[in-house]
Amino acid sequence: MKAAVWKKKKVLEVDDVPEPEAGPEDVKIKVEYTSICGSDPHIVDGTLPVSYPPRIMGHEMSGTVVELGKDANTKGLKVGDRVTGNPVRYCGVCDYCRNGQEHYCLKLAVFFPPGTMAEYVVWHEQQVFKLPDGISFEEGCLTEPVSVCLRGIDLSDVREGSTVAITGLGGIGQILTQFALLGGASRVMVADPVGSKRDLAMEMGADLAVDPAVEDLWAVGMKFTGNRGFDTVIEASGAEQAAKSAFDLVGKCGTLVYFAVYPMNFVLPMKPFDLYARELTVRGVFMSPYLFPRTLALLPKLKLKPLVSKIFPLDEVVQAFEEQKASQSIKILIKSQG
């Protein structure tokens, strides 16, 4: 079968690889779409050392069940089901798994399967979930990033009447904007230097969109909140300047969530006195724990189709990665079939 294989640092190629075989508890899936995660190009370039070549890339997937192992019978899955899945499998017995922190499972590295930018993938039944009726394959492959956004919102203390600022309007920022509004935020300000991304966020319901390249984000934010600062600030761009600016936007007793991958050597200047005097809460978001059931229930509430900027066939995956790095698109999909 064809697959997008990360061969070595900065080398991604479409290659012929053996078609995977399903074990007793596995589900074999014909992959329809994989969404490029913002972290994927950084992994290939070697600037995010969370995985190592050779490896099939991709983890945000939708597809169709084509085979079930003889013991894959606990979820009622059947051949022909439209599915998505969690790219990692949890052991269920380590301290993290038993404490609701499955995303830090001690066996993640052992259970991390091959990627989904391929014609077929085999995942353990535990990882596979049926898509809700009415959710397309194109929307369904965004389930994993939606689950991580749900984790971010859970940590962000957004509540009825909150003021929220979101910096960075890629797929994550656009989904977070919708979740903030669903969570009861009264006013949402967003920021991104790309005009089309700002326009889409306004269509999603944001109250104000700011271009941080030409406007003073702090001054605009203070005017927006009556000089109080925001109850919640979520930094989702990964830009170093945005990470610094976000700290100044948070109001007293507010929550700041860093929801992006930053360079490993980037040090954020922060005064502990400000944490004390303003009673701030600062959090990071890594991955989502067991949130897929909640996520799937929420998919019909979200506007996901407008987030898909472009679709590339699997044979053009290298071009798609270059497009992703240009930072002009929101979500780019790889079509595995046809």
Where are these regions (language model features)?
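Glycine-rich beta-strand-centered segment in the early N-terminal region that forms part
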Residues: P20-T34, T47-D95, P132-G134
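N-terminal glycine-rich cofactor-binding segment
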Residues: A3-E21, G38-E67, T84, R98-P114
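C-terminal hydrophobic helical "lid"/dimerization subdomain
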Residues: A3, E215, K244-D248, P289-G338
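Glycine-rich phosphate-binding loop and adjacent beta-alpha segment
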Residues: E203, E240-K301, S336-G338
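NAD(P)H dinucleotide-binding glycine-rich loop of Rossmann-like/cofactor-binding domains
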Residues: R89-T167
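Mid-domain Rossmann-like dinucleotide-binding core that forms the NAD(H)/NADP(H) cofactor-binding site
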Residues: S136-V214
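Short amphipathic alpha-helix with an adjacent loop that forms part of the alpha/beta core around
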Residues: D216-G226
